[in-house]
Amino acid sequence: MKASLRLRLDQLCDRHEELTALLADAEVISDNKRFRKLSREHSDLTEITEVWGKYRQAEEDIETAEMMKSDPDFKDMAEEEIQANKVLLEELESQLNILMIPKDPNDSNAAYLEIRAGTGGDEAAIFSGDLFRMYSKYAESQGWRIEVLSENEGEHGGFKEVICRVDGDGVYGRLKFESGAHRVQRVPATESQGRVHTSACTVAILPEIDVDTNVEINPADLRIDTYRASGAGGQHINKTDSAVRITHIPTGTVVECQEERSQHKNKAKAMALLVSRLENAKRAAADAATSEMRRDLVGSGDRSERIRTYNYPQGRMTDHRINLTLYKLDAIMEGDLTELLDSLHREYQADQLAMLAQENGG
């Protein structure tokens, strides 16, 4: 292992010890915001610290075994000990390399899921509904909670647009590779000739940003409108102007929330979504400056970037970014996304490791 990496790991362990002490300090405990921030940093460093401790212990065990080799009675046992620990060192070093990949600070956050029908008319709206159901099923399997903020239903089912908040541990980190254009090839229910049609939907995944700590928005830059929510009616139909639309005038960004009966709650939720939209746009602009220097699996986040095809006649799903094809479309549409998401994360880790090796001179 390189000396520079050893030094960095020692520094991280020192920081972990420092954080442990800080989190026991009464002054820190009384400051909720600071306590949460330090707790998250402590949690991020815990696994690295534990694995680095195991690595150093394995090195010490090898040194001890090397000294035992001089005794004929213990030579064979010492050789076995040395070989076993060398294998362990390789495994632990691989773990450390992955753990040292820079983490997106938003990975542990909740996320906003936005699905919009693209080309394909009614069929695109129906497929938007299918994608929403797919993500909802996956969220349920993970113990996450989905809260719809606004929806615009299609005339024949599904959604022209649906925006929701997905709450749970590590939601953004798990779903962030889903942004892009999703294409479907199938025979629509409305197709009398049995011809396969191609439609598309766009998906955007945005990390939820803490409204209180990260962003300052001038109230003068906002136009806030209230209106009566549209929908299919029924027991939850809005009889008052409780739906809220907020426009950020400098950027033209528009958000809305219509699901709560309380105008105050709708405004708060719309404001939280606006903050996340603005921060995401700012981050995308900053990333664009360095995007030409590296291949990034997350891509530009451009909704026109086609990332996946769902082919119903062949029962397959293909992710074009990593050339992965899975012939279990029915299971995927029922929310079985584990194999797909794991594959995307492995590819991302491989990209990041290659980039780190390049930055460290090979």
Curated annotation (Swiss-Prot):
Keywords on record: Cytoplasm, Methylation, Protein biosynthesis
PTM summary: Methylated by PrmC. Methylation increases the termination efficiency of RF1.
Record bears the keyword GTP-binding: no
Compartments (UniProt record): Cytoplasm
SUPFAM superfamilies: Release factor
Chain positions found as N5-methylglutamine: 235
Molecular function, one GO term: translation release factor activity, codon specific
Domain of life (superkingdom): Bacteria
Cellular component terms per the entry's GO annotation: cytoplasm
Protein biosynthesis found in the keyword field: yes
HAMAP family listed in its UniProt record: Rel_fac_1
Family membership noted in the UniProt record: Belongs to the prokaryotic/mitochondrial release factor family.
Annotated function: Peptide chain release factor 1 directs the termination of translation in response to the peptide chain termination codons UAG and UAA.
PANTHER family reported for this sequence: LD18447P
Protein name: Peptide chain release factor 1
Organism expressing this protein natively: Acinetobacter baumannii (strain AYE)
